[in-house]
A protein has these predicted regions:
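N-terminal pre-domains immediately preceding structured catalytic cores
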Residues: 2-209
């Protein structure tokens, strides 16, 4: 009887050991697979969008090009002599619809100006702003459309509000973040909602004088 009990205990111990080893092996496999899957086949390269933007400060025009061919042009207002628009090539990665506006700190022209919320009267950004150089350089709309074609801004590129909305839609689509028309309908009809869109593929903007 004692011999039989001893054999049973040994068998139970052996079964427990085998089960423990099997579970340990499964746990190792579960940990290993995600680590391999996390990097396998991932492309971490930044892909630029197929269209490019080109702003010429002397002609006060902004062109949209694809493969060297101009597909759209817009008239813009550029920076005044005291507040020049930066020259160079920049990457557009962010667009804000119904943006709020805060007076740029340490800017003489912005003294005594008060912040404006999304869609608020007197908001100089209008319906959309397209970031091209941090912290405060954008392509945005203007209520003073008569200033287009002149050097009137504080460094940004100003456009007709309808034109800049058209441009922002195009940039979003080409940058891999398209939206349905009902999304834009909501933006236009609910002006107090600020929406930020980050592009999957940056769009290049080159500014020359």
């Amino acid at each position: 009887m004692k011999l039989e009990m001893t054999l049973k205990r040994k068998n139970l111990a052996l079964i427990a050991l085998i089960a423990s080893t099997a579970l340990s092996g499964c746990a190792s496999a579960q940990v290993g697979v995600p680590e391999q899957a996390a990097t396998a086949g991932r492309d971490t390269t930044t892909h630029m969008a197929p269209v490019t933007l080109h702003a010429d400060l002397s002609s006060k025009m902004l062109a949209v090009k694809r493969g060297g061919e101009t597909i759209k042009t817009y008239q813009v207002a550029v920076g005044q002599d005291r507040y020049p628009t930066p020259i160079g090539t920049f990457e557009i990665r962010r667009i804000v619809w119904n943006p709020s506006w805060h007076p740029p700190p340490n800017s003489e022209w912005a003294k005594n100006k008060t912040p404006k919320g999304p869609g608020e009267a007197g908001n100089p950004m209008k319906v959309v702003k397209i970031f091209f150089k941090d912290p405060d350089y954008y392509i945005h709309g203007t209520g003073d459309v008569e200033s287009l074609g002149s050097a009137a801004s504080h460094g940004c590129l100003r456009m007709d509000p309808d034109d800049v909305a058209d441009l922002a839609k195009l940039v979003m689509t080409e940058g891999g973040e398209p939206r349905e028309e009902n999304w834009f309908w909501r933006i236009i009809h609910f002006r107090r909602e600020e929406k930020t869109v980050y592009l999957d593929s940056p769009v290049s903007l080159t500014i020359t004088d």
